[in-house]
Swiss-Prot record:
Residues 52-60, 261-278 are extracellular. This is Bestrophin homolog 1. It comes from the Eukaryota. The keyword Transmembrane applies. The chain crosses the membrane at residues 32-51, 61-82, 243-260, 279-292. The gene is best-1. Ca(2+) binds at residues 300, 305, 308.
């Protein structure tokens, strides 16, 4: 099941996330407790053997081995491997959730475009919804063990009401060597839904070809999303990738069982404390092994972990919602004036409890900035100093030869004479083309000087 904890994190109090640590279902503690116990037992056994069962020479050899592994433990790039893989898995999980399939749009389109309160119009709408949901059921049966247990055979799909017996017979008639073994019959209910749309148009329940095309497009989008879910299950991430991550994490802590042993050399002055419990190594194990468990859970969200997708609940929700929409065609309220129809200023009401909570209305970050002006002088508008209109005005005073390079002699002074009549400056459509073709003009490289 999906563990929802949003209610507990509505505010950002210091203890908000701390309280989440005490949850068990779907928690990191439930995911890593077995591995942690095994790790600590192995660590403790080696520590006891080192301190009680080894001779002095064996202890010196073991201490050398500890120092050797401890200095080279960083050779395993654990943070890089885990971080990159988690990013890939989270992106994949997000894509699966976005395409898992919510049938509301198909139902709303069917309700809007297949019009009529007759029994046949209702049958058209309900069958289209049922066929679309049947596509999802067929895919989930082959991907999710929860759905497979719910519908172990196609006969159970009929018994649950998602198919009729004659539809199952037609469905089974498509069995070929290719279809039956490779499970490629997901397209059949989608084809039925599209054919129903065509028949509804032919019988006049859909008023125009445009409405029919819109309805077909929504069914096609639904089928495409379900296909993406199927494709992600069919083609997982390359096996060597999760193998590499799993191998890196487990070998890291296998080496840590020796590398993190606390050794105290009697002939040296050391300030180490002989602790029986490896506190920092324990914390590191929780973090890194928990990171690996996050990957394990999110890599296949159609499994049976606590936080995997609720496929059966989604099927129930879709068929209930879809048929409810299909049974209420054009069910709009009577057209009346709204409560604020005669109000100039709409009274915005709140409950007594929320009326004193301040609202921070939307506005731009610099919308309240007031720029200073010199006295009451109006703001003068002019073209940019590097614009083509400015360039034309500068060059209208005098032409220069091809080889003349000093154009500063024709610059304008920065007084009122330069600012006059900017609004009269115009740029005809052929100016730029003439400027490129007329070799008598010399384009200044720094027009901002003028």
């Amino acid at each position: 099941m999906t563990i929802n904890y949003h209610k507990e994190i509505m505010t950002s109090h210091p203890w908000t996330f701390f309280l989440l640590l005490f949850k068990w279902k779907g928690s990191i503690w439930k995911a890593v407790y077995m591995e942690t116990i095994i790790f600590l037992i192995c660590y403790g056994i080696i520590s006891v053997i080192y301190k009680t069962a080894m001779g002095e020479s064996s202890q010196r050899t073991f201490e050398s081995l500890v120092r050797y592994f401890d200095k080279r433990l960083s050779y395993i790039p654990l943070e890089f491997v885990l971080g990159f893989f988690v990013t890939t898995v989270v992106n994949r999980w997000t894509k699966l959730y976005q395409t898992i399939g919510f049938i509301d749009n198909v139902g709303l389109m069917a309700n809007c475009y297949i019009r009529g309160a007759t029994e046949k119009a209702r049958i058209y709408r309900r069958n289209i919804m049922r066929y679309c949901e049947l596509v999802q059921i067929l895919v989930f049966r082959d991907m999710s063990m929860r759905t497979r247990r719910r519908f172990p055979t196609m006969e159970t799909v009929v018994a649950a009401g998602f198919m009729n017996k004659h539809e199952l017979e037609l469905y089974n008639s498509y069995d070929t060597k290719y279809n039956s073994k490779l499970g490629t019959k997901y397209w059949i209910p989608a084809n039925w839904a599209l054919c129903m749309t065509y028949k509804a148009r032919k019988d006049g329940y859909i008023e125009s070809d445009y409405f029919k095309a819109q309805m077909e497009g929504e069914i096609r989008t639904w089928r495409t999303n379900i296909e993406w879910v199927c494709n992600y299950d069919w083609v997982p991430l390359p096996l060597m990738y999760p193998q590499l991550v799993c191998l890196a994490v487990n070998l890291y802590f296998l080496v840590s069982i020796i590398a993190r042993q606390l050794v105290i050399e009697k002939h040296k002055m050391v300030d180490e404390v002989d602790v029986y419990f490896p506190v920092m190594t324990f914390l590191q194990f929780i973090f890194y092994m928990g990171w690996l468990k996050v990957i394990d859970v999110m890599l296949n969200p159609f499994g049976e972990d606590d936080d995997d997708f609720e496929t059966n609940a989604l099927i129930d929700r879709n068929i209930t919602m879809g048929l409810m929409i299909a049974d209420n065609p054009m069910s709009t309220p009577e057209l009346r004036k709204d409560p604020f129809y005669d109000e100039v200023d709409v009274p915005l009401l709140y409950s007594e409890e929320s009326s004193n909570i301040p609202n921070h209305h939307y506005h731009g970050s610099v919308s309240e900035v007031r720029l200073e002006q010199k006295g009451n002088a109006p703001v003068m508008m002019m073209p940019h100093s590097q614009s083509a209109a400015n360039l034309r005005r500068m060059m209208s005073f005098k032409s220069v030869d091809e080889d003349e390079k000093d154009i500063n002699a024709f610059s304008m002074s920065h007084d009122d004479a330069r600012m006059r009549n900017w609004r009269e400056v115009s740029l005809d459509s052929s100016f730029l083309a003439d400027l490129n073709e007329n070799k008598e003009w010399k384009i200044p490289t720094n027009p901002q000087k003028f």
